[in-house]
Amino acid sequence: MASLGVNIDHIANVRQARLASEPEPVQMAFLAELGGADGITVHLREDRRHIQDKDLKLLRATINTRLNLEMAATKEMVEIALQVKPDMVTIVPESREEITTEGGLEVVNNKEKLREIINNLHSAKIQTSIFIDPIEAQIKASKEIGAGWVEIHTGCYANASWEKQEIELAKIKASCAQARSMGLHVNAGHGLTYLNVEPIAAIEGIEELNIGHTIVARALAVGLQNAVKEMKSLVTNPRRNNF
């Protein structure tokens, strides 16, 4: 049964749209935990477009569940992670031009740089995950550089037409099986919604799903605590015959 990590970046997006003091991500993280979140995920981007450094520090000091920091593979971000000490760091690709993360990290051609970062994080007892596309070579490279976890990018599945979703789902299933056979832990996320999450949640071996935008959107109608509760129900009790 997968657990649920709630990404609260979009709470900060609303605040930063007016450079205001509300909504407060820390308060919303508390409500997410009340709704059943097993962890809180934030992406501290280099351009600080939503989550700010102070948010990360306050979350580390206040949340009762796990803190997962998504970050680019840069010296600045590694230094911040070593100071804040989140429970997990997920290394993601990052481009200032993108609206959101557009794909998995290129591990194969950046193994030495990533290996050094992972070693530094592990020395501080910070678990490290690599956000990758469901591609065999990227999984193998993630294992080779010492990552303990991978997070499978589900964006292609989420954006696929109904006819092609099953093909993308099969890729994710195969990648999960491959990663587990190598001794890697597996998370998944990106683009998942209340309508498409169950087939992913039903995949054997996926330990956590990180979901944000759809929960924040649903919260406008039912409140954040209820929105998280609804998603938690789908993640922990998925129907297994969606396809």
UniProtKB/Swiss-Prot annotation:
Q: What is its EC number?
A: 2.6.99.2
The enzyme's first-digit EC class, named in words, is: transferase
Q: Which GO terms describe its cellular component?
A: cytosol
Q: Which GO terms describe its biological process?
A: pyridoxine biosynthetic process
InterPro entries attached here?
Answer: Aldolase_TIM (IPR013785), PyrdxlP_synth_PdxJ (IPR004569), Pyridoxine-5'_phos_synth (IPR036130)
Residues annotated as site: Transition state stabilizer: 151
Q: Record's HAMAP family?
A: PdxJ
Record protein name field: Pyridoxine 5'-phosphate synthase
Q: Which organism is it from?
A: Prochlorococcus marinus (strain MIT 9211)
- Lineage start: Bacteria, Bacillati, Cyanobacteriota, Cyanophyceae, Synechococcales
